[in-house]
Every structure is written in C-alpha cells, then in structure tokens.
C-alpha cells in the first residue's frame, strides 16, 4: 500500500514522502492518526505540484539548516549530573540535551535529537537531524556535580 506522509514519522520517512507500508499499518494507524493519506494518482499529482512550488523555499531552509549545523559543531556542551564515581544517579537523555541547547540559544525539538540513554560520566555524541539532508553529530560531555 502506498501512502503520502503528512508529517515526519520516525523510522518511516519525512513529510511529503511517498512510501510503501503494509496495508494494516497504513489503514489502522497512519491514516486514522492523520500521519498519512492514501497515495492515489490524483494525490500524487497534487503532491508533485506542491513540491515544485516549494522547491525554491526548500533551498533557503537547507541553507539555514547548514548554518545551524556549523554553529552546533562549534558548541561545547557540558551537562552536569549527580554521580557516584563514574556512574550517574539517573540518566542523560535527548530531553536533557535539548534543554542544554535551548540555554545556549539554539532551540531544537527533542524529537530531532537521537542519543542513547547515558548512565556514565564521559564524552558522547548525539545525532541532530536539522533537515532530511542535514544531519550533524553533536559532541557533549557529562561531568559530575560538585
């Protein structure tokens, strides 16, 4: 079954992508939740027309995302957490990284930050998806609270 995504769906695709999914997934989840519409020939034609009109806007969005990526690469993020030795009491997740980015003046939604759950002190990398074509590795360090 082919569908057109109305918004980004993790592990499936981005907004306005035409993707093939199993019929049950599309009919019972994606379409009722408003994440997708059925990819009929007329819907594909309308999508192609809309994408053509948005092509010039897309170039500006990609340029802005690349500029933000360069800013993020230059950032040094230090997160503090309570720890006993090398092990944290609790964990650091993408929510904590998003809050640290917001404090530095670069607000990015936590959904676009991918990092595992970190439970030890040290240096790590998070993946930030700014655009479908712009993905940046964000280094961060976790230090113990004093």
UniProtKB/Swiss-Prot annotation:
Keywords of this entry: Ribonucleoprotein, Ribosomal protein, RNA-binding, rRNA-binding
GO molecular function, a single term: structural constituent of ribosome
InterPro entries documented for this protein: Ribosomal_bL9, Ribosomal_bL9/RNase_H1_N, Ribosomal_bL9_bac/chp, Ribosomal_bL9_C, Ribosomal_bL9_C_sf, Ribosomal_bL9_N, Ribosomal_bL9_N_sf
Any matching Pfam family: Ribosomal_L9_C
Annotated GO CC locations: ribonucleoprotein complex; ribosome
Listed GO biological process terms: translation
Role, per record: Binds to the 23S rRNA.
Sequence similarity: Belongs to the bacterial ribosomal protein bL9 family.
PANTHER family with a match to the protein in the record: 50S RIBOSOMAL PROTEIN L9
HAMAP family: Ribosomal_bL9 (MF_00503)
Protein name listed in UniProt: Large ribosomal subunit protein bL9
The species this protein was found in: Flavobacterium johnsoniae (strain ATCC 17061 / DSM 2064 / JCM 8514 / BCRC 14874 / CCUG 350202 / NBRC 14942 / NCIMB 11054 / UW101) (Cytophaga johnsonae)
Protein encoded by which gene: rplI
